[in-house]
């Protein structure tokens, strides 16, 4: 019997903050593995998603949105991570927001061009473009920048052109053994998953009030047989003022955040969960 060839490679998703990288990743994988919000820089660290279909395995890395210094337009936060991640890439997906090409997109493009790795451009959120005719001149404008393997307009939310996107990605995967078992969809640890579930609720409840430096630390994670999960987590903020914002009047905000986080953890792990949240400041 002829053995099927296997294909496997890393696909890096890059772009400015809030262009839809995490939404795209979730839709490709078919499960929510990366939190999504309108707040910039929701993704704080690399999120790895794995999609195995037949003899093809794509390992996606959703990188934090590239942040720029307001004074000189230089890349700052996550810059080293940006370079390190591209070292293992088979393909780079560069996402841009509709036809909004800025100097920051130009800088990102110039950086990823240096890697000599094939680049696929995705024009996201096309559902928000009422006059689709304007897409053609914009695509022609992009074609003059570099010889991209493809320029694909999509709506990550509405999953338009997703099958075409997957087929393009498969065509660039090298012949290789699969790195992960077929059942794997992410390399995220349970600790990380829980901290992200909590952080998502902090973002949703606090919105613009949310301190940008907020971090969630899982202090303990204990499973009592298959009966219950006991979790203690610390929400770290910078100062007392930020602490009061997170807690809310009479503790109302933190109670709601805790309740919904607990429910979402139970849905994720299919087990009754006891969650204790502490808000601490670093001063």
From Swiss-Prot:
Residues 7-175 form the Era-type G domain. Residues 154-156 are annotated as: G5. Residues 124-127 are annotated as: G4. One of its GO terms (molecular function) is GTPase activity. It is found in: Cytoplasm; Cell membrane. Residues 62-65 are annotated as: G3. InterPro entries: G_ERA_dom, GTP-bd, GTPase_Era-like, KH_dom-like_a/b, KH_dom_type_2, KH_sf_prok-type, P-loop_NTPase, Small_GTP-bd. Residues 15-22 are annotated as: G1. This is GTPase Era.
């Amino acid at each position: 019997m002829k053995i099927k060839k296997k294909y496997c490679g890393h696909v890096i998703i890059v772009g400015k903050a809030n262009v839809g990288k995490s939404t795209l990743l979730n839709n490709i994988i078919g499960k929510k593995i990366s939190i999504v919000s309108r707040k910039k820089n929701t993704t704080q660290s690399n999120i790895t998603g794995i999609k195995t279909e037949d003899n093809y395995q794509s390992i996606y890395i959703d990188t934090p949105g590239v942040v720029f210094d307001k004074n000189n337009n230089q890349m700052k936060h996550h810059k080293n991570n940006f370079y390190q991640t591209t070292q293992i890439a088979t393909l780079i997906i560069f996402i841009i927001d509709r036809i909004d090409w800025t100097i920051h997109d130009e800088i990102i493009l110039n950086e990823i061009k240096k890697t000599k790795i094939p680049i696929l451009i995705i024009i996201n959120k096309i559902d928000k473009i009422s006059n689709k005719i304007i897409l053609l001149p914009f695509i022609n404008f992009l074609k003059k920048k570099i010889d991209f393997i493809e320029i694909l307009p999509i709506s990550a939310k509405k999953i338009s052109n997703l099958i075409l996107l997957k087929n393009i990605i498969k065509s660039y995967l090298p012949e290789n053994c699969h790195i992960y078992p077929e059942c794997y969809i992410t390399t995220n640890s349970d600790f990380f998953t829980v901290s992200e579930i909590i952080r998502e609720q902090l973002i949703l409840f606090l919105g613009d009030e949310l301190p940008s430096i907020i971090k969630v630390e899982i202090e303990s994670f204990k499973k009592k047989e298959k009966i219950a999960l006991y979790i203690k987590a610390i929400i770290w903020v910078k100062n007392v003022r930020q602490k009061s914002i997170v807690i809310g009047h009479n503790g109302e905000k933190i109670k709601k955040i805790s309740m919904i986080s607990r429910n979402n953890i139970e849905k994720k792990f299919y087990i009754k969960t006891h969650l204790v949240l502490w808000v601490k400041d670093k001063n």
